[in-house]
Design a protein with these regions (language model features):
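Transmembrane alpha-helices and adjacent helix-loop boundaries
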Residues: 3, 7-215, 219
Length: 219
């Protein structure tokens, strides 16, 4: 039993490493799901179709008006109650749906930020509404929304901590395992706080570098 305890203590770093891996995995795929949903819902909000516009607006209002943790619990315990699915995938779906509502507003705001004269110029050149949106509006809007999308990814990394409500697979779950082994509740939580901080700083630095690379150089 003493050897087992020593072995478990030696595995603590592996628990944290595995938890970090799941945190990043869930965040990455969730933001991809959120991006797809967000783009669709953004165009829904801008649509002239009242039904599509109404559905998109209702989705955004409900998701932004309810806590992420409640959405996660509803999806896991109600929607997927009788479905055999990995819990990390439930997290991807739940956080993706949540992120989609915020990304929708980011994308919509980016499109609306483009001067109306750009649309009029495209139409005057003989382009259709879709061609104007595809070749003139969207390329400019993408540059405007990239910083906000980066911030959404950072927020998502931190929000994934609530997946501990359904599974101890992320960093918080790793801290709980260490706590149950050592009965120390301070060091494990401070450790994952430090890990989160370092990860966020690295991601923020990489995002800033990408933005600088994609931004036009001043002349």
């Amino acid at each position: 039993q003493r050897q087992m305890c020593i072995r478990d203590r030696d595995n603590r770093w592996q628990w944290f490493l595995s938890g970090l891996g799941y945190t990043l995995l869930i965040s990455f795929f969730a933001v991809l799901v959120g991006l797809v949903i967000g783009v669709v819902m953004a165009f829904g909000r801008l649509s002239k179709n009242k039904l599509f516009r109404g559905i998109s607006g209702l989705y955004i209002d409900i998701i932004r008006g309810t806590p992420t943790m409640v959405q996660l619990l509803i999806i896991y315990f109600i929607i997927f109650a009788n479905v055999n699915i990995d819990r990390w995938m439930v997290g991807v779906i739940a956080f993706g749906i949540n992120s989609g509502a915020y990304i929708a507003e980011i994308v919509r705001g980016g499109i609306l930020s483009i001067d109306q004269g750009q649309t009029e110029a495209g139409r005057s050149l003989g382009l259709t509404q879709r061609q104007t949106m595809t070749y003139i509006i969207i390329p400019q809007a993408v540059k405007n929304i990239l910083p906000a999308l980066g911030n959404e990814f950072i927020v998502l990394i931190k929000e994934t901590a609530v997946i501990g409500m359904i599974a101890n697979i992320d960093l918080v779950g790793a801290a709980r395992k260490v706590q149950s082994l050592t009965y120390d509740y301070v060091v494990p939580m401070l450790s994952i706080a430090l890990i989160y901080y370092v990860v966020i700083k690295i991601v923020s630095t990489l995002l800033k570098a990408c933005l600088l690379y994609t931004s036009p150089s001043p002349r």
